[in-house]
């Protein structure tokens, strides 16, 4: 997967998703929002409808897959049940696993590290953070929970 994408599912935390998009675009990064549905409209955890740049089918059709660079990024905002909806979408989780295996970068916010990234098969020794109370999903997979706002590993 080439590029930077932030994936949206119903119940996402709007501030985590759209503030991230805003800051990245201001910084010159061409980030695209992707609805995991056939429709571009996704509803936030506070019932605010948002129009994504593309629906999941458009993402699959327009994105080149293959060897990744660290600059190829998949971003998962938090929010509940948004994070659970992302994690339940098998096609996206398959792409995440492939992307991670090929050396692409994964970024997750708030609940998403525990709910989404914990689905990766090997977190042994990875330093990770998440929303308070969600640590167990990471530590049971061998990750080291770090109580910090931002962690890079």
What name fits each language-model region?
Residues 2-12, 23-35, 39, 53-153:
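Active-site-adjacent pocket-lining segments in enzyme domains
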Residues 19-21:
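Histidine-anchored nucleotide/phosphate-binding helix
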Residues 44-53:
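A cross-family phosphate/adenosyl-ligand binding-site feature
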């Amino acid at each position: 997967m080439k590029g930077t994408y932030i994936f949206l599912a119903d119940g996402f935390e709007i501030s985590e998703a759209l503030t991230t998009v805003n800051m990245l675009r201001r910084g010159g990064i061409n980030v695209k929002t992707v609805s995991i549905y056939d429709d571009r409209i996704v509803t936030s955890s506070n019932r605010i409808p948002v129009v994504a740049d593309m629906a999941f089918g458009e993402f699959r059709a327009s994105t080149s897959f293959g060897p990744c660079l660290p600059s190829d990024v998949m971003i998962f905002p938090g929010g509940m049940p948004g994070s659970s909806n992302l994690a339940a979408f098998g096609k996206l989780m398959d792409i995440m696993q492939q992307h991670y295996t090929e050396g692409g970068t994964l970024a997750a916010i708030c609940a998403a590290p525990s709910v989404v990234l914990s689905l990766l098969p090997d977190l042994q020794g990875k330093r990770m953070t998440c929303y308070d109370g969600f640590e167990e999903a990471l530590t049971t997979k061998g990750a080291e929970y770090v109580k910090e706002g931002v962690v890079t590993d």
